[in-house]
Amino acid sequence: GVDKEGCRKLLGGCTIDDDCCPHLGCNKKYWHCGWDGTF
């Protein structure tokens, strides 16, 4: 994910990883942001 205004929080809707906030990635199964394993 990326640190930008309007980034999606955990379980927020997404289509790509960069829709999500830092440390989150887009889960293509559920189309929401989930933790990507980074700190």
Swiss-Prot record:
Tissues where the protein occurs = Expressed by the venom gland.
Subcellular location(s): the record lists: Secreted
**Gene Ontology terms describing biological process:** envenomation resulting in negative regulation of voltage-gated sodium channel activity in another organism
Q: What InterPro entries would the database entry show?
A: Huwentoxin-1
Modification Phenylalanine amide occurs at: F39
The record's GO CC annotations read:
extracellular space
- Give the record's family classification: Belongs to the neurotoxin 10 (Hwtx-1) family. 47 subfamily.
What protein am I looking at?
A: Beta-theraphotoxin-Cm2a
